[in-house]
């Protein structure tokens, strides 16, 4: 597999394993951004538990899948998004208004678009899942 970005490779392997009906998937290499992205997905119930395995190299993450993930992806390049522009990005990326989440990296950390709107912070778009 050609390494485009670590986050893109991790989300793509999760999506492919979900389509094949697998119960768990191993993501490697790991990064802090992937772990924060997975925490947001887990908070909304799209994945089960995940575990970081330190192999004294770049590390691995084993993710439990629960069959709820339909699509996930990375937005590249990471566009700047203000608080007022979040609504336009959700309309463009997600299938409906109340379905799915956009993940942003902000000055307050990595969070979904609803939490960013509540905290009134903008940032850069990392990706989406639904």
From Swiss-Prot:
Record's keyword annotation contains Chloroplast: no
Signal peptide: none
Name the record gives this protein: Small ribosomal subunit protein uS8x
InterPro entries named in the record: Ribosomal_uS8, Ribosomal_uS8_CS, Ribosomal_uS8_sf
Pfam annotation, one family: Ribosomal_S8
One annotated GO biological process: translation
Organism: Arabidopsis thaliana
UniProt GO MF annotations: structural constituent of ribosome
Family from the record: Belongs to the universal ribosomal protein uS8 family.
Gene Ontology CC entries for this record: cytosol; cytosolic ribosome; cytosolic small ribosomal subunit
Domain of life of the native organism: Eukaryota
Keyword Ribonucleoprotein part of the UniProt annotation: yes
């Amino acid at each position: 597999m050609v390494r485009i970005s670590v986050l893109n490779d991790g989300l793509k392997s999760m999506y492919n394993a979900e389509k094949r009906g697998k119960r768990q998937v191993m993501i490697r290499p790991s990064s802090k951004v992937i772990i924060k992205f997975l925490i947001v997905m887990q908070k909304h119930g799209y994945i089960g538990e995940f575990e970081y395995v330190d192999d004294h190299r770049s590390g691995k993450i084993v993710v439990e899948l629960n069959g709820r993930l339909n699509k996930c992806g990375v937005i590249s390049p990471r566009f700047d998004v203000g608080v007022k522009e979040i609504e336009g990005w959700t309309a463009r990326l997600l299938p409906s208004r109340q379905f799915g989440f956009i993940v942003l990296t902000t000055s307050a950390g990595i969070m979904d678009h609803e939490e960013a709107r509540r905290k009134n912070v903008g940032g850069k778009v990392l990706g989406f899942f639904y």
